[in-house]
Amino acid sequence: MNVRHLINSRPLAICCLVFLMLVLTACGGGGSGGSSREGASASPPAADPCDATSDPEDGVCRPVAVRVDARAPTPFTEDGRPVSLEVVIFKPPGEGRYPTVVFHHGSTGNGSDRSLFGQTFVSATLTRYFVERGWLVAFPQRRGRGRSDGLYDEGFRLDRSGYSCREDLALAGAERALDDLDAVTDWLQGRADVDTTRMLVGGTSRGGILALAHVARRPEVYRGALNFVGGWIAEGCGDHRAINQRLFAEGAGFPGPTLWLYGTRDSFYSVPYSRTGFDVFTVAGGLGAFHVLTPAPGDNGHFVINDPSLWAGTIEDY
């Protein structure tokens, strides 16, 4: 599949428009439970000087996107109250239906810092890449994350002190997350600005492995999946192989192409480890391409999403 074939040919009308400049959180999609690996800082690179609605040009942040803060209804209730999910949408200015990428966040490291649960995840670099090519980008926040309702309960230890390395608890958390992905997908398909014939799903870290498992469950909706450094539990965790390989193998049920993007010096998943997950996926019948990205010296490969020079050409050819 070639992403360029999904893009409208009409140019973007970006002139004489003024947009509210909002400071957006570009973190919170980091690790995936357990201890990080040695050899790289677990912190993301410095924040982009422009937010997701603008692009740096000659030292000035040039407006490129319209931001929409929305809420997706779900079939879930907690304590007798309906649960809705925060969805941050960026799209080109003007009316119309746009090819859409739904991009899912990761975890919060090891799950022990509750102050991170309320941070809303968006990616300015990914947004600019897609919006400038005529796409709508949606960033859903799963239950208990960002400004979404509900309890954040994606595979915690029984005392909720952090993410669990136990296979049963971790996979139960993944199933809960996949239910959220289903609810958001259903809601997006009803929006007037979404071209439901041209949709991709993607994510980073936990969001990446969720995108693979989800696309196999909704092949009638999505044309492909973008997996940035995907995994559910870090390779330092006890049951990591059983957990991650189970979810990767599930993604093999999708009949279309998938794209796997992993960085060297990743503090949670080494390249050989991630390639083993890809092998499990392909042996199970999955279709995909595995790419190794090399970030700048000293940068943590788990945050390659922040450097489009590493992956823009690869996605363009996908």
Q: Which positions does each model-derived feature cover?
A:
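C-terminal motif of bacterial Sec signal peptides marking the signal peptidase cleavage site
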Residues: 24-26
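Bacterial signal peptide processing site
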Residues: 28-31
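N-terminal cap/lid segment of alpha/beta-hydrolase-fold proteins
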Residues: 47-96
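Short substrate-entry loop that stabilizes the transition state in hydrolases
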Residues: 96-98, 107-149, 234, 268
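Alpha/beta-hydrolase active-site loop
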Residues: 155-192
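Primarily recognizes the serine-hydrolase "nucleophile elbow" in alpha/beta-hydrolase
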Residues: 179-253
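The feature captures the conserved acid-bearing segment of alpha/beta-hydrolase catalytic domains
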Residues: 224, 229-289
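C-terminal catalytic histidine-bearing segment of alpha/beta-hydrolase fold enzymes
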Residues: 284-318
